[in-house]
């Protein structure tokens, strides 16, 4: 079994960019950014429970990571950068910590490396279980209206929030609920130590108004990049700036590729 996705052709010899979306997104999420990086072949994936992979269920991070590995093999992707946002960033970090063959670098936007202590982990598990139940039982428009009122999304304008609610409500609620619990931050190991031992370029991107993940960025041994005029969803709020940031990162590294 492999994940569904969409490819974009690039120039021969350039490494692949493998894009992973956030919770309730799909393979379209990074398309505006990817369109501004035409030299690079790209794979935009639908994660389990999302988009055309909505019928794929996983039990946890190990299974997602194996699915990702199998998918890359199926596309014969031998050298690649992982680029992930939020949930996709957490999956990207977890996968990178498994030392996959062919990984050139890691770019994470607003992804959490993991929780430190058991009380926080328990509280998060309870919160995610409640959200998952809502996704399974309530109209998605109602759930996402509440979801985007969370403090991390405070920088969103009302029109942006309404657009996201309408877009995300096209999902399958049961599939989202299952994926939310399977990949809950409560289930994710604390990846800080493993990420400190990385032997690949690690870049962390966040919006200037995203105070929570700006603080998290300081805890990581990653090169930090602040996106102006953006909050937690920087690649949607300011795609041109995120694309320019990625282009700069990739230009600096392309000369190092054998």
Swiss-Prot record:
Gene3D superfamilies: alpha/beta hydrolase. Keywords: Lyase, Menaquinone biosynthesis. GO terms for biological process: menaquinone biosynthetic process. It comes from the Bacteria. It catalyses: 5-enolpyruvoyl-6-hydroxy-2-succinyl-cyclohex-3-ene-1-carboxylate = (1R,6R)-6-hydroxy-2-succinyl-cyclohexa-2,4-diene-1-carboxylate + pyruvate. One of its GO terms (molecular function) is 2-succinyl-6-hydroxy-2,4-cyclohexadiene-1-carboxylate synthase activity. Pathway: Quinol/quinone metabolism; 1,4-dihydroxy-2-naphthoate biosynthesis; 1,4-dihydroxy-2-naphthoate from chorismate: step 3/7; Quinol/quinone metabolism; menaquinone biosynthesis. Its EC number is 4.2.99.20. SUPFAM superfamilies: alpha/beta-Hydrolases. Monomer. Belongs to the AB hydrolase superfamily. MenH family. Catalyzes a proton abstraction reaction that results in 2,5-elimination of pyruvate from 2-succinyl-5-enolpyruvyl-6-hydroxy-3-cyclohexene-1-carboxylate (SEPHCHC) and the formation of 2-succinyl-6-hydroxy-2,4-cyclohexadiene-1-carboxylate (SHCHC). HAMAP family: MenH. NCBIfam families: menH_SHCHC (TIGR03695), PRK11126.1 (NF008340). This is 2-succinyl-6-hydroxy-2,4-cyclohexadiene-1-carboxylate synthase. It comes from Enterobacter sp. (strain 638). The lineage of its organism: Bacteria, Pseudomonadati, Pseudomonadota, Gammaproteobacteria, Enterobacterales.
């Amino acid at each position: 079994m492999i994940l569904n996705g969409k490819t974009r052709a690039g120039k021969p010899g350039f490494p692949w960019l493998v894009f992973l979306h956030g919770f309730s997104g799909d393979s379209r999420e990074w398309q505006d950014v990817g369109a501004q990086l035409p030299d690079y072949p790209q794979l935009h994936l639908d994660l389990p429970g999302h988009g055309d992979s909505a019928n794929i269920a996983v039990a946890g991070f190990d299974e997602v990571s194996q699915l990702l590995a199998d998918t890359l093999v199926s596309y014969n992707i031998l050298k690649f950068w992982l680029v992930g946002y939020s949930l996709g960033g957490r999956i990207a970090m977890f996968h990178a910590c498994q030392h996959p063959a062919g990984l050139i670098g890691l770019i994470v936007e607003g992804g959490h490396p993991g929780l430190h202590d058991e009380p926080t982990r328990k509280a998060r598990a309870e919160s995610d279980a409640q959200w998952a139940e809502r996704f399974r039982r309530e109209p998605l428009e109602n759930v996402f209206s509440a979801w985007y009122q969370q403090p991390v999304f405070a920088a969103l304008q009302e029109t942006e929030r309404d657009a996201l609610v309408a877009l995300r409500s096209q999902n399958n609620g049961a599939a989202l609920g299952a994926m939310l619990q399977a990949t809950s931050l409560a289930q994710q190991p604390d990846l800080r130590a493993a990420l400190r031992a990385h032997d690949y370029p690690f870049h962390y991107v966040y919006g200037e108004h995203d105070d929570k993940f700006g603080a998290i960025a300081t805890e990581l041994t990653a090169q930090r990049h602040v996106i102006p005029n953006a909050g937690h969803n920087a690649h949607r709020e300011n795609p041109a700036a995120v694309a320019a940031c990625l282009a700069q990162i990739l230009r600096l590294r392309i000369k190092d590729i054998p």
